[in-house]
Amino acid sequence: MDYKTLRKNYRLYIRSAGVLAMLLIICVGFVVRDTLLQTAGLLLVLAGLFLFLHLLKKSYTNKCNTLLHVDLDLAFWQQYLQLNKNVKKPILQIDMKLTSVAYSFMMGGFDTVIKEAREALSQKELLQKYKNFFESYLMRSIVLTDPDLSREELEVRLNELTITDPVLAEKTKKVCLALYDLTIAHQSNDYFEDLSNDFKYQQLEIIYYQALNATLKGDKSRAEELFRKLVSEDESLYIVQKAQQYLKDEGNYL
């Protein structure tokens, strides 16, 4: 299902629930004469409405997250960003900014990620939970765009992180050091070897860096096997393009 249809159905269900609740309230007013029972009926209808809306929003959010992250439906990503680009609420604006940063990161637009993440982090009212993710994307993008970055400079930057989530902070440091080894220092690093993830892009990312690690260890057969797992995916993804390039350079891409 595309995002436009999903959002249209979600809004239709909300309106339908509101209309149904109004009709039930009117019916209660006509049918029930006892004031106490009318009040009880009204409260019951409202409670049912709020419960339905809560479950509906939860289902809608879960479906969006599944299509965005678990299925990695890139057409859904594009529609989601396009149709929500003019949201008015500040909290929704920053949420869309983070979603845009995540999309740019997957596409290999690391300069855009750095620019937008820094813009977001400059906002004094930005909630810390968003700061954490913007900082993480920023640091990873810096490593992937600066071939002259020294390990000492990287470690200084990592020590200056203000990520308050200890799990994300530790993960960001380990990922950045692994990326440095694999893409700048060109030395093997086993960080990605035992990782797993429920989200598809992260799964593909793990495969890509496992392949890089195998290449640096001289295990070309394993590297080729891993890169071939990626080339069947959407070629607009940065890591798919890199996998295709590797196989072309090796003369093994069909």
PLM regions and their residue ranges:
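N-terminal alpha-helical membrane-insertion module
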Residues: 1-77
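N-terminal topogenic membrane-targeting module
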Residues: 50-125
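Residue signature of alpha-solenoid helical repeat architecture, marking inter-repeat boundaries
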Residues: 54, 86-93, 128-133, 165-170, ...
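Short coil/turn connectors between adjacent alpha-helices in alpha-solenoid helical repeat scaffolds
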Residues: 61-70, 104-111, 142-152, 177-187, ...
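"A position-specific structural signal for the A-helix of alpha-solenoid helical repeats
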Residues: 62, 92-103, 133-141, 169-180, ...
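Alpha-helical repeat scaffolds
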Residues: 75-84, 110-123, 147-165, 185-199, ...
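Alpha-helical transmembrane segments and their immediate juxtamembrane interface regions
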Residues: 123-145
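Long, non-transmembrane cytosolic or organellar matrix-exposed soluble domains/tails
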Residues: 194-254
